[in-house]
Amino acid sequence: MYKGVINFTRRVRDLDHTPEYWQSESYSERIKIIEAVVMDKTTYPPTKKLQSVREGVFKVPPTITVEQLVDLSKALRRWYKIDCFQIAINRTDNTAHMLFDWIDRETGQSIYYNTSESIILTVFVLRFLNLPKPENTRTWFRYDLLWEY
């Protein structure tokens, strides 16, 4: 999301199945739900440019489990309204892949965050999983302090 710590990109299919994998719904099932929500709230079909499903990719240590990432997904849903429905951990390069639904259920529109909100989201993930702060994030001190109080 910010300077290579967490990268969010548009995704148009399911995550690859790995030995450490969790799924609440398939991609096609979630797209049907998203289309229904958008039609219900906005009364028009979703556009092709709508980035309703995005994949979040970030480095994790070998000790991180799928259960910890499921707990993270619940916290992200509660705090940021983004709903994770698939998780995979690739142990060859120790990366976590999480597939998120970025549609606001109240408005039917895609959720977007500005730079400050993106940094806060990234710090939230790093602190939730007790991951080390990358070197290029020294200027994030004030966002780190936000979670202390």
Where are the regions a protein language model picked out?
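N-terminal nicking endonuclease/strand-transfer module with a His-rich metal-binding environment
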Residues: 1-149
